[in-house]
């Protein structure tokens, strides 16, 4: 028996019994706190002889399949006799109930009071069980890599790879596992104790012991780690895992090493809503009247105030639509959609200059941690379907990172839908070519075409169709670095009929593909339609003008291009335009979309053309400019010091 007690002390101390969440006067759970019913063996019957009565001892069956024999002295109560035996096992009498096993009725027991005189029970067999309403549960550890900044709740040092309890949120390093508190707080049961402190146990009709004082509850909450307090300060409902083995289960395997937490446990679900716990503590401290508690309805929480104690099946069947219904509810803090953090409050952005307006919105220069471009979209009173579709597209746009793509910085949904992007100091390609008439050299024009194809190839690799590719949406940033903007956003670039998204011709007429103008398909936008728009941009680069400049009627252009009667005049291209570039322009603006190349092929063609262009290499005989001064000095020195040769 001393060996068992000594081993149990080692296990308890190894798991940091002194660092438990509750103080010493409250309930402390052992390492394994499932309510394993003690199974008496047939060989145990009849072992109790008259010698036990003469030796003043009582045999006691304890939780977790343990047993002990205690000595009884006159004047001692059950509480005094069993205190030491329970304490060395990490238990407290306030958390347990004691029963006397009836010898005449096998399997039946009668509950005793802890103040009962122990002398009257000499020679009897007693059993100690956990109380049903006591919030005892075990940690549910899972190995986790913390991608966001996190710190160990034990040593308060940086934590990258470690463990985290799925129930209470306790996180720690593997080498700190010996200091983890043994008790994991079951918040649903604590909530019941706070709201119904005078509740009784209805199974046997025997009143339950007095509930824990409110002071202990406050202390237990205040002694939680900082990260756990922050976790339970939000008003959301959490779903965590906790082990729930059968009460008749047995400890068939040895205790695991204390250096590694047990991360393999059967899981069921528990719901936690800590705002109600805080409200209950506050209301209880202000007024302890029953009316203050009864005024709160039972259906304020998605999880409910009270949960009946029903056996949890090993595998719970889920309704077909339960998954989607749960996702539509308030998201837990740890599982919140990451696009939430990309939403910007309208009050944080300061708009200054109106840059211009287009088919789908107005662009402003603004201030939000620096210069940004804010595009307020032309969507009035968006429906919930439009708002959700807009957020879905934003979730795709926020993942774009490329040197030739405008950096997406966030979005706004209050009052108006708006997107916030990187600010480009340079002008658009349209302004350079047709307003300022900047004179680019041919190799510069080819490099602009290459960068544009490179950015579009990246967007298509992300399954993003631009839908409005034109020279107005191509910006030259800090010299000749191409930045493509206003991509995606099919929600804004479509017409909505009720809750249904209906495609319509979008974009500028000169850059619209023939199939987009005709709108014969439900969704005419494709990678090939973007290629056609890119071909018109190539025409602008290589011709220095817009296509169909001789046609002044917009409707005529729409009719002729849609019918296939008109195409860009390739004879207007520059005379020094390479033949490979002329062929590429002709391929991109073909009337049949299946005949157009895709951007990987376009990009490789332009790169091959760049490598084939003749380059002017510096002459090897030309002196370096930074060495010219030294050369002059040497020549002067040579001329002045050369000796005169005698003349014969």
From Swiss-Prot:
What positions are modified (Phosphoserine)? Answer: 29, 43, 233, 252, 259, 289, 296, 301, 338-339, 471, 494, 497, 499, 621, 642
Where along the chain is composition biased (Polar residues)? Answer: 239-265
Bias type Low complexity, positions: 286-301
Cofactors named for this entry: Zn(2+)
Phosphothreonine is found on 268-269, 491
The protein's superkingdom reads Eukaryota
Chain intervals for the UniProt region annotation (Interaction with PEBP1/RKIP):
331-349
Annotated protein name in UniProt: RAF proto-oncogene serine/threonine-protein kinase
Native organism: Mus musculus (Mouse)
């Amino acid at each position: 028996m001393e060996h068992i007690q000594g081993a149990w002390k080692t296990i308890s101390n190894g798991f940091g019994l002194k660092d438990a969440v509750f103080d010493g006067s409250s309930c402390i759970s052992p390492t394994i706190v499932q309510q394993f019913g003690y199974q008496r063996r047939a060989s145990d019957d009849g072992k109790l002889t008259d010698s036990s009565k003469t030796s003043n001892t009582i045999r006691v069956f304890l939780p977790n399949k343990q047993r002990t024999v205690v000595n009884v002295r006159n004047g001692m109560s059950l509480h005094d006799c069993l205190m030491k035996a329970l304490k060395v096992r990490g238990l407290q009498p306030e958390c347990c109930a004691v029963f006397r096993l009836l010898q005449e009725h096998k399997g039946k027991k009668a509950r005793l009071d802890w103040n009962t005189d122990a002398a009257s029970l000499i020679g009897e067999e007693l059993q100690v069980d956990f109380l049903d309403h006591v919030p005892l549960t075990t940690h549910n550890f899972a190995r986790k890599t913390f991608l966001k900044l996190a710190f160990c709740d034990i040593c308060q040092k940086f934590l990258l790879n470690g463990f985290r309890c799925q129930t209470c949120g306790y996180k720690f390093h593997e080498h700190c596992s010996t200091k983890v508190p043994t008790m994991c707080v079951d918040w649903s049961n604590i909530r019941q104790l706070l709201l119904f402190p005078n509740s009784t146990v209805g199974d046997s009709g025997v009143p339950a012991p007095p509930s824990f004082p409110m002071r202990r509850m406050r202390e237990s909450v205040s002694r939680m780690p900082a990260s756990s307090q922050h976790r339970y300060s939000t008003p959301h409902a959490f779903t965590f895992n906790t082990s729930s083995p059968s009460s008749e289960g047995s400890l068939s395997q040895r205790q695991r090493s204390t250096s590694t937490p047990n991360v393999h446990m059967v899981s069921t679900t528990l719901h936690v809503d800590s705002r109600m716990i805080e409200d209950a503590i506050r209301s209880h401290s202000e007024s302890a009247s029953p009316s203050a508690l009864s005024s709160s309805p039972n259906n304020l929480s998605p999880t409910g105030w009270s949960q009946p104690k029903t056996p949890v099946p090993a595998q719970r069947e889920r309704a077909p639509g339960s998954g989607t219904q749960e996702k539509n509810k308030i998201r837990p803090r740890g599982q919140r959609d990451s696009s939430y953090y990309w939403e910007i409050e309208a009050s944080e952005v300061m708009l200054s200059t109106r840059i211009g307006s287009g088919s789908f919105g107005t662009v402003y220069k603004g201030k939000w941690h620096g210069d940004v471009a804010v595009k307020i979209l032309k969507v009035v009173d968006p429906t919930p379907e439009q708002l959700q579709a807009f957020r879905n597209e934003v979730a795709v746009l926020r993942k774009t990172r490329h040197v030739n793509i405008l950096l997406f910085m966030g979005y706004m949904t209050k009052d108006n839908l708006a997107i916030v992007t990187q600010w480009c100091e340079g002008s658009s390609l349209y302004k350079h070519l047709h307003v300022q008439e900047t004179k680019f050299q041919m190799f510069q024009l080819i490099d602009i075409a290459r960068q544009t194809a490179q950015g579009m190839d990246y967007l298509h690799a992300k399954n993003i169709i631009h839908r409005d590719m034109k020279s107005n949406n191509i910006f030259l940033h800090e010299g000749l670095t191409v930045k493509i903007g206003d991509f995606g956003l099919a929600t804004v670039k479509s017409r909505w009929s009720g809750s249904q998204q209906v495609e319509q011709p979008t974009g500028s007429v000169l850059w619209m593909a023939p199939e987009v103008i005709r709108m014969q398909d439900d969704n005419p936008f494709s990678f090939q339609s973007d290629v056609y728009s890119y071909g018109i941009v190539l025409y602008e680069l290589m011709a220095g003008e817009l296509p169909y400049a001789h046609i002044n009627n917009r409707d005529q252009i729409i009719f002729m291009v849609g019918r296939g009667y008109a195409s860009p005049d390739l004879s207007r291209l520059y005379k020094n335009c390479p033949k490979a570039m002329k062929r590429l322009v002709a391929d991109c603006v073909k009337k049949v979309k299946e005949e157009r190349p895709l951007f990987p092929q376009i990009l490789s063609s332009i790169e091959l053309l760049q490598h084939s262009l003749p380059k002017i290499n510096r002459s090897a005989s030309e002196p370096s400019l930074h060495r010219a001064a030294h050369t002059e000095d040497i020549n002067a020195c040579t001329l002045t010091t050369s000796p005169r040769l005698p003349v014969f």
